[in-house]
A protein has these predicted regions:
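Pro/Thr/Ser/Gly-rich low-complexity, intrinsically disordered linker/stalk tracts
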Residues: 223, 227-268, 312-323
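Extracellular low-complexity, O-glycosylation-prone stalks/linkers
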Residues: 269-285
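Active-site neighborhood of glycoside hydrolase catalytic domains
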Residues: 23-135, 139, 150-164
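Substrate-binding cleft of secreted/luminal carbohydrate-active enzymes
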Residues: 132-148, 157-158, 163-245
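Active-site-adjacent "subsite" loops/lids of carbohydrate-active enzymes
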Residues: 1-38
């Protein structure tokens, strides 16, 4: 369907849906509903585009919309703009919950929370407080350091506001090996990516990572693809990112070993993680992930199995068996 021109606004480098128009707000909800109804998607994701980031001398040019839709309800045009974005964010989650609640809603805002609020009119702090977003993925596309606009500074700021919302960190691997002088010397080698991951790994509220982009990973400039392989060398299960407390799958039963093969009874709709015990009170080692109900063990030891469902909710561990 063609987009009515009257529903759009043009700026120097971008054409956007007019955030102030009720017709636009409804259309976005309709699009989301159509996607999750027609297709078996895991989630709906929104990037960092809300109101546009204006160039010098450019105006938002929305006084007419404020006069028509907002002047009687809001004290300022800035408050009006933030509400327009709030309505879309809140309603996307609502239509998902009402239509197909297993679908996840994620947003990846720019790193600077204050700029999101004052320039893009995205009140991310409010969304997190109200629980309107299931997963937040701040784009921390900066080098590590102690100063303003560093990876560390931005991550610390986000950790103040992330509570019930799942948080994944967005890493800007596209900057590594770039000739753009604005990026700085830290991106001339892969070492800073390792530092970024090390810093994020110390934050208990960080649930995982998202890398932008796959093209740059494959290009392997300054060995960034190799560094990523090293960072991800240990197996892991995908975290559960649902908005409600997970309903755990059934625990695998009748776990047994036979000549180095571990087997168990099937759990409907599940895949499985196999762990090796490192002793009481110590973190077990994930040795394999499989959709089969048997697994070739890597060696002698004590093992257990868990079941995971489509949403990656993980069951309690099975009984321990020793081979």
């Amino acid at each position: 369907t063609k987009i009515p021109v009257a529903w759009t606004k043009d700026y120097n480098k971008i054409r956007i849906y007019n955030p102030a128009m009720p017709e636009v707000q409804t259309r976005i909800m309709d699009i989301v509903k159509e996607i999750i109804t027609k297709y078996d998607v895991d989630g709906i994701h929104m990037d960092d585009y809300f109101y546009p980031s204006l160039e010098e001398g450019e105006s938002m040019n929305d006084n007419a919309e404020y006069e028509k839709y907002g002047k009687d309800k809001f004290k300022s045009i800035e408050e009006f703009r933030r509400n327009n974005v709030d309505v879309v964010i809140q309603n996307i989650q609502k239509v998902i919950i009402d239509t197909k609640p297993g679908v996840i809603f994620s947003v990846s805002p720019a790193a600077n929370i204050d700029n999101n609020y004052s320039k893009l009119f995205a009140d991310v702090r409010k969304w997190l407080k109200e629980g309107w977003v299931d997963v937040i993925i701040p784009q921390l596309y900066f080098a590590t350091g102690t100063g303003k606009n560093s990876f560390n500074q931005f991550l610390d700021q986000w950790m103040q506001y992330v509570n019930q919302t799942h948080c994944l960190i967005g890493y800007g691997i596209y900057k590594f090996g770039s000739t753009d002088p604005d990026y700085g010397n830290a991106f001339h080698s892969s070492a800073d990516l390792k530092s970024q991951f090390e810093y994020a790994s110390k934050k208990s509220k960080v649930n995982g990572s998202v890398l932008y982009s796959i093209k740059d990973m494959v290009a392997n400039k300054v060995g960034i693809g190799t560094a990523i392989k090293e960072i991800y060398k240990k197996k892991t299960v995908i975290p559960y990112l649902g908005r409600t407390e997970a309903k755990l799958p059934s625990t695998p039963v009748k776990v047994r070993t036979d000549g180095g093969n571990l087997s168990w009874e099937a759990v409907p709709g599940a895949y499985y993680a196999v762990y090796k015990s490192n002793g009481e009170g110590k973190l077990a080692t994930l040795v394999g992930i499989t959709r089969e109900t048997s697994f070739k063990l890597p060696g002698k030891g004590t093992y257990c199995v868990t079941a995971l469902d489509k949403a990656n909710a993980e069951s309690r561990i099975s009984e321990l068996v020793t081979y």
